[in-house]
């Protein structure tokens, strides 16, 4: 039988496994919210550790917290930050919308670990109390939003942006490598005028570059922190200067540019910054969906598709068709993008649900945001390393497409006019002949003139 100890809260005593650091409120949450399997994301757990350490440092500096207690809280919080106590954060996402249970989970774990460090009895709340000491100058209403912003900003900066830059570099390299390969363009999925394969991939690279810039542009607002607003934004029970000092400490711990939010009422009641940054991520997902689709369609075949690109062959593609290989990286990436689109709908709705002085959809916002960041970052690296870098052009097929395209007739607009050119193209399409055969045979111009005007390499730039 598992050994237990007694923990207490305002509802009375409750048994907790003796080897677990959490206390009564986390234990009650385990019983009250048996919903799903989605645990509180580890980046949020780390961020709660950062908040508790920063708050202890600020309270110590302001003379509110005994130095010995503060030092021990900081030591225990560091273990949370380092991931050493992850097993002691068992709560699911689906809990109170303020994140109170997860905040108390952090308070209790740090309290009991600090008590253990000081040689005390876990569950006694002495000499380190989860509310009076670990949660000093704080409310769940400002602590969880602060942790949410820290977690999301850290993941964007350290995981998402580097992954997107990795993809951008690979796409830009292909654009430079293929700058002289002329291919036929397509609009409305139909043949259009020529461009180079490098220009096409240069467009993809620019989409990702723009996406990176959009995300970076949103970060200053995401890095504004609610801490110091306490229950409703007034800062009740937080000493003067606490908000500014705790933000400074958080910036120091993370190495990121966190600041105190200029208006704590907005910071508690609305999470527009979360919606805004995720909107930029959603836009990147839209870009990635387009790029992944183009690449898999251009690589369709190998015998009966467009066949302009040869995609890396990573694994067998069919359990029934021998030799079949599929564009699996594009398929994985587009599924990720679909998930991000759904997450953005959730975040948009949740962000609108600030009722009076508090938004109570915090955990689901954090969960969906962090899932999007993790998925896009991982998928961008996978798509780059397992697809983009190994793509090769099928030059013969590309050349054949250019030679057979009727849209080269556009080069004759200036000499023959739109109507005559349209007639040449339609006749060639109807008869299964070439533009040259119809233009020269129909007496529109000589063979030499056709050679002079219809030059694909002259059709890939203005003029």
Swiss-Prot record:
Keyword terms, alphabetized: Cytoplasm, Lyase, Tricarboxylic acid cycle
The protein's matches in SUPFAM superfamilies, at most eight in alphabetical order, are given as:
L-aspartase-like
Q: Which InterPro entries match?
A: Fum_hydII, Fumarase/histidase_N, Fumarase_C_C, Fumarate_lyase_CS, Fumarate_lyase_fam, Fumarate_lyase_N, L-Aspartase-like
Q: Which family does it belong to?
A: Belongs to the class-II fumarase/aspartase family. Fumarase subfamily.
Recite the other comments: There are 2 substrate-binding sites: the catalytic A site, and the non-catalytic B site that may play a role in the transfer of substrate or product between the active site and the solvent. Alternatively, the B site may bind allosteric effectors.
Q: Which organism is it from?
A: Caulobacter vibrioides (strain ATCC 19089 / CIP 103742 / CB 15) (Caulobacter crescentus)
| Task of the protein | Involved in the TCA cycle. Catalyzes the stereospecific interconversion of fumarate to L-malate.
The pathway to which it is assigned is: Carbohydrate metabolism; tricarboxylic acid cycle; (S)-malate from fumarate: step 1/1
Q: What is its EC number?
A: 4.2.1.2
Presence of keyword Cytoplasm: yes
Query: What is this protein's name?
Result: Fumarate hydratase class II
Molecular function GO labels: fumarate hydratase activity
Entry's NCBIfam families? fumC_II (TIGR00979), PRK12273.1 (NF008909)
One GO process term, biological-process aspect:
malate metabolic process
Q: What is the enzyme's class at the highest EC level? A: lyase
